[in-house]
Structure formats: C-alpha cells, structure tokens
C-alpha cells in the first residue's frame, strides 16, 4: 500500500517525478483525470483554509469525489479507535487525506487502512507544503541545484520536512533560531547521515547571507502555548534588512497564514521578492501530483 506520510519515505527520483507531474498539471500539459470514479476522504482534526480548499478542488479536478470529515463527524473523540476508523473508511473510500493533531494518528491510520493515506499536516511534519515550496523554487530559479535555503525561527513541523527535503535533494539548509527551539536531534542526525549540508545557528544574518530562499512560519502555531515564544523569536523576524543579505534574486516564502509585524514585516511579505501566493497556488498542483502518484494505478 502506498502512503504519503513523510518525504523521507521516498527516494529522490520518486519525489522528482511528482514535482514533474505537478508542473505538467499546472501548465496544462497533463489534463488526465486519474481519480475518475474514486472517492477521497478528507479528515480535519485542525481547521484549515489552504489544505481544505486545495485538496477539495484538486480531487475534483482529477475526476474524483471529495468527502469532507471534520473531527465532529468522526467517533474518534467518543471511543472509536484510530485503527477501527481506518478499517471502516477503507470499506467506503479509495484514499484518505488527514490533517491531524498528532503524527501518531496518521501512522496508526495508515497501518490499519487498506487504502492510501496522505499526511495533510501533523505536529511533526508537513510534506505537502514542502512539495509545493520545492515546485515554487524550481519555477523561480529553474532548479533546486545550488539552492541555499535559510529557515528563520521555530524548528517546527515545516522545518522538519525541510530537513528531509535537504537530505533528499542535496541543497544547503541553514536553520536560524533559538537553541531551545531546534528540530529533533534524531532527525538532524538522519539527514546528516544522508549527506545533507545543514547548518544550525543563532545568527540570522549569517544564515541569510547569500541565501537564495528565505523561509519562515508563524511563531505560535495553532494549539501551541505562546509563553515566551514571541520574545524569543523576535531576533529572527524576516525584515527587508535581512533580505538584503540574501542573493539579489532571493525569494521570500511562508506557508501562511502569516502575522505581519511578527515573524515577517509587511514590507517583505507584500514586496516583490515574496512568493507566498505562488506557494499557496502550488499547494493545489503539488497535491494533485501527489494524489495521482499515490492513489492512481497509472503513475
């Protein structure tokens, strides 16, 4: 059974094939409908704008029928196990995408389902977002070769998936943030064992210098305890001064929603180097490609 849970579950060639398909679907070179006659469930333990709309539209464009399930529609909170939910949904659906609070929910669902499971986001990773981001970088710079990615702030789920991508595609990744907010040591060790060039620093200027991409995310994610996060993260705000340290054609990226004046200034996110709305659009195309490769028998 093919699932899409983490980037590290795939080899580089397989992910590149998905990116190639995403580009063809976006350009109109691929107008196939590989999900024709298929029903794809969408489970949301956390609400979403981009994930909900991009998957629902994408499933429909590929010829499938989306079936949306919120946490209130399921029995998970009232005693039914994740394992049983996976077994039941397998009798009705051809695949399921889940946006979950805990990564373990996704892995347990996949272990017990007889249909493909796609990770729409968990507390540990966000692989669909990174596929859209990689597509955006290729559009802007032609390829991923020689890319220097600067991540600012929290070593969160999105950062974790960037680490996996760096190990698989071989670009340089610089993670600038407070030491207390660094990504898991085991994940960093795995990536470095794969040959990834990953730099950890508490100096945002050093991380941004000569970077081709500067990326950040909200400082306080949905469900997180704010605590001292905003104070701790303030030195890692994406500003125009920091963008000037990067390459002249560097792009700014953010998975959205963004809080202007916090992790990024309005001048940057609304400026000419910002690619945030290209990223948002590419969620649609990247996820269509993922679904085609994971769900269809013809990819």
Description of each model-found segment:
Residues 192-267:
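Rossmann-like adenosine-cofactor binding region
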Residues 45-57, 141-216:
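Glycine-rich phosphate/diphosphate-binding loop of Rossmann-like nucleotide-binding domains
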Residues 1-53, 57:
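Positively charged, low-complexity intrinsically disordered leader regions
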Residues 32, 94-165, 254:
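Anion-binding alpha/beta catalytic cores of soluble intermediary-metabolism enzymes, centered on
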